[in-house]
Every structure is written in C-alpha cells, then in structure tokens.
Regions:
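Rossmann-fold NAD(P) dinucleotide-binding segment
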Residues: 29-48
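Adenosine-nucleotide cofactor-binding segment
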Residues: 1-33
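Solvent-exposed, non-membrane alpha-helical residues enriched in polar/charged side chains
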Residues: 11, 39-40, 63, 125
C-alpha cells in the first residue's frame, strides 16, 4: 500500500490500483458504487475482490468487463442471488476463467465465529449496564 484514498477519490484510486477489495456495507450510498464507469477506469490486468455485497457492483457492467478483458480478474464470495454461485447455462460470471468464487462462505472460520460471539457478549453486557455498544447500526442508512 503506497497511498490511502477517501471515497471522494475513488476514480483516482481505481486507476492506480492493482487490486481493489470491496469490504463496504450495502447502503443507499454504496449500491452500484462500482459502476460501468469505475470498471472502465480499472487497469486491464487488475483484480477486483468482493467480500462485502454483490450489489456494490453493476452486475451487467462486470459481466461485460470479464467477457471483454481476459486479463481482468475477479474473486467473489458474494452474489446477487445465492444460486448464482453455481454456474448454469447463460452468462454467469463463474463460467469465465478469469473469475473465481466461493459460495458466500469466506468468513466461515472458528476464529470468526468466536470473535462474533465475544463481540455479541460484550455488547449484551454493555447494553445491560447502560453503556454504549460497539458497532451500532444506523438503520436509516441500510435498505430494508
């Protein structure tokens, strides 16, 4: 990592990035963030990794990028529809050799589960004691 970018600098960041990792929440502001325009700015031989939500990416634009740019690579653990993780007839991403995916299970580890449990227990205790909880979600930011 040579430089950190803000969201306002997304275009500049993707032009320079060899790897773009999406680890953002799916909100009204992030839906479709990786648009056809943003994909067009990415290096032809770059890698896009999505471990957040598929809805952050314009699906049709990504499919076009993958089809037309064999040096562009994608790694995904999230899908617009869960059954899309398994290729069938048609233009599914996993049908292309420059795409690798897993079935929405990359976070499945004993460490991740233990950490989630410990965080939940901490927050329950804090809530019961009238203290602030960590990671409180603003429901207005998220789709319902």
């Amino acid at each position: 990592l040579h430089k950190a970018y803000t969201m306002d600098q997304l275009e500049e960041a993707v032009k320079e990035a060899d790897v773009l990792v999406l680890a953002l929440p799916f909100t009204k502001e992030t839906e479709g963030l990786i648009s056809r325009h943003i994909l067009s700015l990415m290096k032809e031989d770059s890698l896009l990794v999505d471990v957040a939500r598929a809805q952050l990416i314009d699906r049709e634009a990504l499919l076009d990028k993958v089809k037309n740019n064999p040096r562009f690579h994608v790694a995904m653990d999230v899908w617009w529809e869960e059954n899309e993780a398994y290729p069938k007839d048609g233009d599914l991403l996993l049908a292309y050799p420059n795409v690798i995916g897993s079935a929405h299970n990359a976070e499945m580890s004993s460490t991740a589960h233990r950490e989630a449990l410990m965080n939940a227990l901490h927050n329950i205790r804090a809530f019961m004691d009238g203290k602030p909880v960590k990671g409180k979600v603003n429901r207005e930011e998220y789709r319902r």
